[in-house]
């Protein structure tokens, strides 16, 4: 396989030197991903640029992305937006969604929520799940468009049905809150669970909450496991919850040191509840040196318990 990739890169090289914009973009990919060529993001940018300047939409998007994240070239959100725009004008759905993001956040362009919606719609109509979810957000909150919960649900569902975790989670939250749809906790649990199983930390936290509260028939005994999954992905709210569980012995052997560790992780991310919990432990004489040391330790104990 390695020989095949190297050979492919050689053919791309020859074609790229002869001016093939598709080959130039492909060679850029070889350098960017380290396939058939040693990984070199600066070289990737140069080949993307050659293709982009010939009007190749995928290369224009790739170059915009490199500018946006500052990989292989100095970061410039304005140049990122310029290249996204060029590709978006050619109907490139990923670029249309990215350009919509620029307008929504005001990165590289003057913030304009209505323009963001316009570009999201272009991408969403081509089946771009991220843009569909973003449209759901815009209709739910009234960003750049008249607020309409029913339409928000329609866009969330389009993306959720394609397995997009963020949309699945939002659909679950809308069902839980009765926002744009009849309140239904079983549907809420179903959709948040799909998102959680797809690895979305926020949805994993939500599932922990649903399980803890017994929402929609969720199993209370599963709460700890979901909070652990979210906490491992640095979700501060889940880290705080693990602290609560360990401090009080909810579903796990009571362990003040482990509680202090998780509270500290959450507090380090700015979680106010965790900061208050640490203050309370210290004022109660529970913030011992041992607990402080445990707070700085690794995160293996929870998984050891869960795995047996």
Residue ranges and their predicted role:
Residues 12, 17-20, 33-35, 40, ...:
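Short helix-capping/linker turns of helical repeat alpha-solenoids
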Residues 84, 227, 254-272, 279:
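TPR/TPR-like (Sel1-like) alpha-helical repeat modules
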Residues 284-288, 299-308:
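Short hydrophobic alpha-helical membrane-entry/anchor segments
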Residues 1, 26-33, 37, 62-69, ...:
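Hydrophobic face of amphipathic alpha-helices that form TPR/SEL1-like repeat modules
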